[in-house]
Amino acid sequence: MSKKSITIITAFIILAALSRLLPHATNFTPIGAIALFGAAYFSDKKWALIVPLSALWISDLLLNNIMYSSLYDGFAWLSSGFIYTYGAFAMVVVLGYYLLKKVTAGRVLGGAIGASVLFYLICNFGVWVSSPMYPITAEGLISCYVAAIPFFHYTLAGNII
């Protein structure tokens, strides 16, 4: 892969991540698409993971310390549920790396749906296990997933578009 291609792909991923700073519906961001794109177009697995995760972290730094600074005591390097968000994101990169070895419309659509489902399941599990909002029971987990359903279609749309 040429240096020019790497630069273009990296710039595209960073711009997509920074789009999270624009006003949007909750979860209507290209987070899964960024991971899938990186996985599909970086031939080196290391960069397919590092560049999208770094772009996510940079946009999180800006969001947490500018837009949501009132929610934190001091400078926030990471959000409280980062392990679940970044873990889901990393799993989407792995999904994309294997699913998008050959890029076709069907595989991209399948990847976008798979990315959305992975993100939904992992991140909402994180909400359930790490916050006092839900009891740590099967009913609490189900309640958490049900409460998150209204946000799922925005995640899916953000990944597809």
Task: Describe the predicted segments one by one.
Residues 1-42, 46-51:
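Hydrophobic transmembrane alpha-helices
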Residues 1-5, 25-26, 70-71, 101-104, ...:
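Helix-boundary and loop/linker segments of multi-pass membrane transporters
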Residues 10, 25-42, 62, 82-91, ...:
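Membrane-embedded alpha-helical segments of multi-pass membrane proteins
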Residues 12, 48-59, 108-116:
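Central hydrophobic cores of alpha-helical transmembrane segments
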Residues 16, 40, 56, 60, ...:
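Alpha-helical transmembrane segments of multi-pass membrane proteins
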Residues 19-27, 54-94:
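Interfacial aromatic-anchored transmembrane helix boundaries in multi-pass membrane proteins
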Residues 41-50, 61-69, 121-124:
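Juxtamembrane membrane-interface segments at transmembrane alpha-helix termini
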Residues 98, 102-161:
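Membrane-embedded alpha-helical hairpins and interfacial helices in multi-pass inner-membrane proteins
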